[in-house]
């Protein structure tokens, strides 16, 4: 079947923040420059709405609808908006699965993480990290959710994962290996480029949703101890707790909140170090952006950041065998400026090679349209 368009399905979309929102927006905009039809089906806190921007048709379905109405409306919208189009599901997995069973249309999935674990963390049900959570005995409601999520992956033609860590989790959920494709998240190297000019007046920057597993409390404490200023970009349920912590320990922290994508390169250009302290990460867009802009980066081993950072070559991975913490990694970077300068250059090269949007988006498009 020759398909002349693409329909991207995502649970979140800008101005909401987060990796899936960023992907849905950049990928659909990119696809609209190649294909005659590009559309997005997503959710919103407001009323149902329909708009067109950058040549992309965007249908937003209200989260205020009751669950049955929302699922049916979503399934019908995905089906209706994907005539002659491939369907790429990056969120709303259960809605897409329902559409498949009711209306018989095939789709490709791109998963950002384990949505069952994320919901359990956000609701306070668990404090476990993503790996330990896999073997835990879940309450009935979550068992049902896990079964439904797995069914949505089994029903897909292909399952795209952005990191080796996530690939191993998906295999453990019982998805056939030959159905899984590893394609890293990627960024536009035109938008995020190295700018050596300008004053570096931000010591440490981090860009993420403010949720517990991002480990921002440790970053605040480390910056407080080392007397470094910290800029936190992003918003989320942990904001108040983090603001209180910063006050309590006298840290110099600037909470910027959610900002427009095109303001990020300027912030990166002013920053010395980027820290990503999450216990789970697929391929973090912010980490890729920072490295493309020549900001020395620190992240965690045993996460998708292992696919991005070559430890002690083009960055530092914490919580690994050599025992780096956020604080000791920052201290090491401050005291080894030659290493940092060399690492920044190598990081930019590696980003161009492995995380190039043009190359990776083409692969995703080919899989979705085949």
Where would I find each of the regions flagged by the language model?
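Conserved donor-binding/catalytic core segment of Leloir-type glycosyltransferases
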Residues: 7-9, 196-214, 220-227, 231
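Membrane-proximal helix-turn-helix segments that form the acceptor-binding/catalytic region
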Residues: 75-79, 131-159
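Short alpha-helical donor nucleotide-sugar binding micro-motif in glycosyltransferases
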Residues: 153, 258-259, 266-271
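Carbohydrate-associated surface elements
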Residues: 165, 186
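Nucleotide-activated donor-binding/catalytic signature segment of Leloir-type glycosyltransferases, i.e.
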Residues: 243-259
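Aromatic "clamp/platform" in nucleotide-sugar-dependent glycosyltransferases that forms part
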Residues: 279
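Short hydrophobic beta-strand element within catalytic cores of glycosyltransferases
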Residues: 296-299
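Conserved acidic donor-binding segment of nucleotide-sugar-dependent glycosyltransferases
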Residues: 311-312, 316-323, 332-337
């Amino acid at each position: 079947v020759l398909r002349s368009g693409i329909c991207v399905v995502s649970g979140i979309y800008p101005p909401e923040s987060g990796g899936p929102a960023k992907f849905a927006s950049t990928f659909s905009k990119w696809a609209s420059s190649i294909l005659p039809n590009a559309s997005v089906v997503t959710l919103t806190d407001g009323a149902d709405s329909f708009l067109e921007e950058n040549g992309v048709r965007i249908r937003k379905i209200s989260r205020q609808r009751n669950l049955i109405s929302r699922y049916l409306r979503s399934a019908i919208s995905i089906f209706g908006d994907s005539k002659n189009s491939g369907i790429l599901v990056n969120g709303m997995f259960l809605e897409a699965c329902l559409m498949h069973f009711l209306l018989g249309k095939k789709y490709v999935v791109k998963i950002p993480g384990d949505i069952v674990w994320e919901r359990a963390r956000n609701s306070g049900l668990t404090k476990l990290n993503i790996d330990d959570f896999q073997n835990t005995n879940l309450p009935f409601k979550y068992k049902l959710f896990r079964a439904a999520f797995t069914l949505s992956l089994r029903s897909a033609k292909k399952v795209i994962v952005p990191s080796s860590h996530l690939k191993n989790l998906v295999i453990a959920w019982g998805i056939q290996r030959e159905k899984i494709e590893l394609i890293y998240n990627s960024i536009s190297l035109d938008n995020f480029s190295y700018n050596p000019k300008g004053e570096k007046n931000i010591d440490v920057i981090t860009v993420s949703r403010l949720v517990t597993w991002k480990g921002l409390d440790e970053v605040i404490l480390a910056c407080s101890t080392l007397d470094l200023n910290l800029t936190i970009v992003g918003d989320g349920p942990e904001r108040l707790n983090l603001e209180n912590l910063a006050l309590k320990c006298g840290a110099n922290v600037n909470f910027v909140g959610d900002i427009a994508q095109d303001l990020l390169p300027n912030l990166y250009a002013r920053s010395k170090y980027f820290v990503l302290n999450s216990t789970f990460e697929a391929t973090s867009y912010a980490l890729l952006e920072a490295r493309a802009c020549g900001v020395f980066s620190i992240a965690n081993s045993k996460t998708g950041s292992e696919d991005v950072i070559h430890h002690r070559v083009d960055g530092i991975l914490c919580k690994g065998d050599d025992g780096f913490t956020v604080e000791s990694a920052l201290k090491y970077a401050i005291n080894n400026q030659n290493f940092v300068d060399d690492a920044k250059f190598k990081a930019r090269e590696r980003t161009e090679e492995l995380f190039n949007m043009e190359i990776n988006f083409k692969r995703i498009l080919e899989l979705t349209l085949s």
